[in-house]
């Protein structure tokens, strides 16, 4: 999995974290899986956005956070374990849900990760992903201002590649809206080249041109910025 340094981790908190109000559709989308008394593994927890969200949304659920980057763990200010998808530092059959938010495109060995997921999941457990997939990106407004970033999609897997690579079956797939920013002006003030996999594919000139387009639009357009990421729920093959 990709490892972030201290500068990238700090930028991530500025550029990528979304308010809990903006994420409210995700609370509703995952609620069926976050049952009282269950244990959730936030795998690739980053700076802890969803650790904090789940604590507020689902107070009767235990969340265990695992993150490979020491800088991200430090920036979170939360208790997190060092580990990654191919080596999860948890006992066998210890979690009911594995949550992975914008993580799976960083996983280098899906087969090894799938074996680890099956190991730590209890019978009947599920893997719940919040992600962008190569063939499903029309809901991402970033491409309007940074069209060259589309070339980075080649590094993102398809839904089938994720499910087949991990060795799970698709149980649910749908686009979930989220309010990424209260306005384009807010979005322009927080966008960071180093904090986004898509933007890091841009040259300095491409990034500057895209930010100029974003600022120009922000001067005349009002209203919230709404993007869509996919919810993908995976179950063990056969549903066992």
Question: What do these predicted ranges mean?
Answer:
Residues 19, 47, 172-240:
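Conserved Class I S-adenosyl-L-methionine
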Residues 1-35, 49-53, 57, 72, 126-154, ...:
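Conserved class I S-adenosyl-L-methionine
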Residues 153-167:
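Short alpha-helix
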Residues 99:
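A conserved beta-strand element that flanks and buttresses the S-adenosyl-L-methionine
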Residues 41-43, 47-87:
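Class I SAM-dependent methyltransferase SAM/SAH-binding core
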Residues 102-106:
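Short catalytic micro-motifs in class I SAM-dependent methyltransferases
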């Amino acid at each position: 999995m990709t490892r972030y340094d201290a500068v990238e981790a700090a930028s991530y908190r500025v550029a990528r974290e979304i308010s809990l109000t903006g994420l409210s559709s995700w609370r509703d989308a995952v609620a069926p899986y976050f049952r009282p008394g269950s244990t959730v593994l936030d795998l690739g927890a980053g700076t802890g956005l969803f650790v904090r969200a789940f604590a507020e949304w689902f107070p009767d659920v235990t969340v265990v956070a695992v993150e490979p980057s020491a800088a991200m763990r430090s920036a979170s200010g939360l208790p997190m374990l060092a580990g990654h998808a191919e080596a999860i530092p948890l006992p066998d059959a210890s979690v009911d849900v594995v949550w992975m938010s914008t993580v799976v495109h960083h996983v280098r060995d899906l087969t090894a990760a799938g074996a680890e997921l099956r190991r730590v999941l209890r019978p009947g457990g599920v893997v719940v992903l919040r992600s962008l997939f190569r063939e499903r990106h029309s809901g991402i407004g970033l491409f309007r201002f940074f069209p060259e970033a589309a070339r980075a999609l080649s590094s993102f897997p398809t839904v089938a590649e994720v499910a087949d690579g991990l060795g799970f079956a698709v149980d649910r797939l749908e686009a979930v809206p989220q309010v990424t920013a209260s306005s384009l002006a807010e979005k322009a003030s927080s966008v960071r080249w180093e904090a986004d996999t898509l933007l890091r594919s841009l040259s300095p000139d491409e990034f500057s041109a895209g930010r100029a387009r974003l600022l120009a639009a922000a001067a005349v357009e009002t209203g919230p910025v709404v993007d869509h990421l996919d919810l993908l729920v995976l179950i063990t093959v056969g549903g066992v």
